[in-house]
From Swiss-Prot:
It comes from Mus musculus bactrianus (Southwestern Asian house mouse). Coiled coil: none annotated. Its main location: cytoplasm. One of its GO terms (biological process) is proteolysis involved in protein catabolic process. This is Proteasome subunit beta type-9.
Length: 219
C-alpha cells in the first residue's frame, strides 16, 4: 500500500547536471591565467566534487565551462574538433581570437538548445595573452572576466583588486582569492581550485586543495 505523498513509478524527475560554478580568466604581459572551482551539482545534490572545468581547445588555448555540464562540454568538444582541422589546414596553431569566434558561433547557433557560457583564453604569437567572453553568442575581449553562479558575489572584489601590469604569480593569487571568496558564498561553487597558466613557454597546471585555500574574515 502506498502512503500519501510517497513516490510512485514515473514520479521521479532527473535533475540536469550543472557546473553551477565560478570561472575566471586574467591577462598578463605574456600570457593568461584561467581558474575555476570544481563542484558539479544536480539540483541540491553535489554529483562531482573535483571536476576540472578548464577544457583545452588547442595547445595554448583553454576554455572555462559554466552552465549545463553536458552542454558546455559539447560546445568545447565541437570547438576543439574544428580548431584541430583549422590548425591542420593552416599548418600552424590557430589564433585565440579564432577559437573564441568558433565558440561564439556554436553558442549562438544552438542558443535555444544549449545552456552554457564559456570563457576562452590563451596565448598566440600575434596578440600574446588574450581573454574573451562568449555569453549568448557575444564576443568581447577583456583584461579579466568572471562568470558562473558564484561570480555575482565577487564583482566588487575583482573590480577593486585588479590592477594592470600584474605578474603571473599576482594573477594566480588574484584568481585564487576571487574564486575562494565565491566558494564561501555560493552553494553551487566549491571543492578545489584548478589553475592553468598559459604562456609562450607552454601550459602550467596547478590544483589548490581545500586546506591550501586562503582564509578570509567570514570564516
Amino acid at each position: 500500500m502506498l502512503r500519501a505523498g510517497a513516490p510512485t513509478a514515473g514520479s521521479f524527475r532527473t535533475e540536469e547536471v550543472h557546473t553551477g560554478t565560478t570561472i575566471m580568466a586574467v591577462e598578463f604581459d605574456g600570457g593568461v591565467v584561467v581558474g575555476s572551482d570544481s563542484r558539479v551539482s544536480a539540483g541540491t545534490a553535489v554529483v562531482n566534487r573535483v571536476f576540472d572545468k578548464l577544457s583545452p581547445l588547442h595547445q595554448r588555448i583553454f576554455c572555462a565551462l559554466s552552465g549545463s555540464a553536458a552542454d558546455a562540454q559539447a560546445i568545447a568538444d565541437m570547438a576543439a574538433y574544428q580548431l584541430e582541422l583549422h590548425g591542420l589546414e593552416l599548418e600552424e596553431p590557430p589564433l585565440v581570437l579564432a577559437a573564441a569566434n568558433v565558440v561564439k558561433n556554436i553558442s549562438y547557433k544552438y542558443r535555444e538548445d544549449l545552456l552554457a557560457h564559456l570563457i576562452v583564453a590563451g596565448w598566440d604569437q600575434r596578440e600574446g595573452g588574450q581573454v574573451y567572453g562568449t555569453m549568448g553568442g557575444m564576443l568581447i575581449r577583456q583584461p579579466f572576466t568572471i562568470s558562473g553562479s558564484g561570480s555575482s558575489y565577487i564583482y566588487g572584489y575583482v573590480d577593486a583588486a585588479y590592477k594592470p601590469g600584474m605578474t603571473p604569480e599576482e594573477c594566480r593569487r588574484f584568481t585564487t582569492n576571487a574564486i575562494t571568496l565565491a566558494m564561501n558564498r555560493d552553494g553551487s561553487s566549491g571543492g578545489v581550485i584548478y589553475l592553468v597558466t598559459i604562456t609562450a613557454a607552454g601550459v602550467d597546471h596547478r590544483v589548490i586543495l581545500g586546506d591550501e585555500l586562503p582564509k578570509f574574515y567570514d570564516e
